[in-house]
A protein has these predicted regions:
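C-terminal functional extensions of proteins
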Residues: 142-219
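Active-site gating loop/helix substructures
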Residues: 39-100
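Conserved phosphate- and dinucleotide-binding cores of soluble alpha/beta proteins
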Residues: 67-70, 103, 107-160, 171, ...
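P-loop/Walker A phosphate-binding loop and immediately adjacent motor/lid segment at beta-alpha junctions
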Residues: 56-58, 62-74, 110-134, 184-204
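Glycine-rich phosphate/diphosphate-binding loops and the adjacent beta-loop-alpha structural elements
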Residues: 1-15, 101-105, 134-140, 171, ...
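Electropositive, gly/pro-rich neighborhoods at or near active sites that engage anionic ligands
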Residues: 1-66
Length: 219
């Protein structure tokens, strides 16, 4: 929804910054929303078999066809600059929350924008990664919790995540089976391996059912 919505808003206002500003008014948002960059970038993936995919939308489709995992994600141009105010906001933050979201097409690309990962590492803020509840077909098939964190560390180095919040809630099996039929499964919480990545763990009941879907509890 978010990608389609912002494309429509940008088409309406002809300016991404203005579309974000107007969206804040529409949804009565508090605080400030900043796009990580104003430059036009392309999210690309290199698979373990050497295949290169130069389109965010095609990544899951090609992976499913080739049954090859992602080796790395990169953005072009690689030296794109952060939007005005982004690095300052990171420096001034009390807490930096990473995730939940699509690991390779959402979370990691934001960290690849020039200076962003470095600013997070240097920040004195509380840096926490919120674990995904389910794996994502075509991106994180069979990924455990530690493999999500390891992928981030391999792309931008250790230091952007200090803590990880993961779910300890019980999910009714019938809902899990619904996701299994679509190629998704619960993220295995291999907590001992997370500690090897140098990340402290925080247990919370994060999951709840909303309109038949497994979601993070906003409370």
């Amino acid at each position: 929804f978010s990608d389609i919505y912002f494309l429509a808003m940008q088409d309406l206002y002809k300016d991404f910054t203005e579309s974000v500003k107007q969206s804040q008014n529409i949804f009565n948002m508090t605080g400030k929303v900043l796009p990580v960059t104003l430059e036009e970038i392309q999210i690309c993936a290199e698979l373990e078999d050497g295949t290169v995919i130069k389109s965010k939308d095609k990544i899951p489709e090609v992976i499913n066809d080739k049954t090859s995992n992602i080796s790395r994600i990169y953005i072009t141009p690689s030296n794109c600059k952060p939007a005005p105010g982004v690095l300052e906001a990171i420096q001034e933050a009390d807490a930096i929350i990473i995730g939940p979201g699509s690991l390779y097409t959402n979370v990691i690309p934001n960290l690849l924008v020039k200076g962003v990962a470095k600013a997070i590492k240097e920040s004195k803020a509380f840096k926490v990664y919120v674990s995904n509840l389910m794996t994502e077909p075509g991106q994180t098939d069979n990924y455990t919790l530690s493999e999500h964190i390891k992928a981030i560390n391999e792309h931008v180095g250790k230091g952007v995540i200090e803590y990880c919040i993961y779910d300890t809630g019980e999910i009714i099996p019938e809902y899990i089976r619904k996701y299994n039929m679509e190629g998704s499964e619960l993220v295995e919480q291999d907590t001992s391996k997370v500690k090897v990545e140098g990340v402290y763990l925080i247990q919370r009941k994060l999951s709840h059912i909303e309109n038949g879907f497994i979601r993070h509890n906003p409370d």
